[in-house]
Amino acid sequence: MFEAVEGMLAEHADLEQRLGAPETHADARLAKQLNQRYAALSSIIGAYRELQQLDDDIEAARELAQEDPAFAEEAAALTGRRQEVEERLRRLLVPRDAADDKDAILEVKSGEGGEESALFAGDLLRMYTRYAEARGWKVEVLDAAESDLGGYKSVTVAVKAKGTPEPGEAPYALLKFEGGVHRVQRVPVTESQGRVHTSAAGVLVLPEAEQVDVQIDENDLRIDVFRSSGPGGQSVNTTDSAVRITHLPTGIVVSCQNEKSQLQNREQAMRILRSRLLAAAQEKADAEAGEARRSQVRTVDRSERIRTYNFPENRISDHRTGYKAYNLDQVLDGDLQPVLDSCVEADLAARLEALEQ
């Protein structure tokens, strides 16, 4: 497995040279791609060189231990350290999703449960926003349809990192595990009898595509315009500023009404459309290669849940990993990392197992 690192050394040196050239930075997108690859290789090569150094130190300690038994303890400590570094290197070498270095488009939609579901969708958006802010990410609302009580029938946001994140630390690499149906159990604000109700909201996470990632023929698009609407369906704009784009070959439909101008809404809708097309192309490629991942839920249904948020018990349960904690209030306030870590670990374990078969 570690033989592959030898080939990475030359690539790493070449990238270092290219990144030092002024002409590379004239193309911002190319510079970003090279920086991401360089960061990934730097982590791998750093661990590999540390492993080599530990091998030398262990050998030296064992030789010295033949004359002075005190060095036997040092050799044992170094051996333990070597096992840790070897495991870290194995993890770094596990193939990741091609889109793991990208920013994310995140959609939250209310499902069964009416107004209560819409309010819960708002709670989820707040959770993701707080989590993103804690990581220094930027959250931009692309489209939103509010409910009568201030929740969301649907809301779409872009989550963008600052600079070049470490491998596995980009928005999509972490937030992709949020895709699916989230179930909530609590007493709704509309419930007068104090009974606990169950409702659900659906989350879809896409890697944000850049224009060069997906080529879209304008002839394949049908673009409709209409007036933006607010809670209850009332019109909030006197002009046709909202935009609906249909990609005819795939049937994918995207609409945006959050911005004041038709041009801005069209640009935002195209961002979402590119990301959906990129995700669809990746899923098709995975399926053709026989490596299809569990697809994220696109229809909001209570029965296909990935996580339950139980307010009476202050409990959060992830049904994929078995993670359970009684700090729901903190999680909804953005303390989402332990939940995501359980998903990352489960995903990594599955990839390692597949790699070793």
Swiss-Prot record:
Which PROSITE patterns does the UniProt record give?
RF_PROK_I
Q: What is its main location?
A: cytoplasm
Residues carrying N5-methylglutamine: Q234
Q: Which GO terms describe its molecular function?
A: translation release factor activity, codon specific
Q: How is it modified after translation?
A: Methylated by PrmC. Methylation increases the termination efficiency of RF1.
- Coiled-coil stretches: none
The subcellular location is: Cytoplasm
Q: Which GO terms describe its cellular component?
A: cytoplasm
Keywords carried by this UniProt record: Cytoplasm, Methylation, Protein biosynthesis
Question: Per the record's keyword annotation, is Protein biosynthesis included, yes or no?
Answer: yes
Stored Pfam families:
PCRF, RF-1
Instruction: Give the protein family.
Output: Belongs to the prokaryotic/mitochondrial release factor family.
- Job of this protein: Peptide chain release factor 1 directs the termination of translation in response to the peptide chain termination codons UAG and UAA.
Tell me the protein's name.
Peptide chain release factor 1
| Organism (species) | Nocardioides sp. (strain ATCC BAA-499 / JS614)
Source species taxonomy: Bacteria, Bacillati, Actinomycetota, Actinomycetes, Propionibacteriales
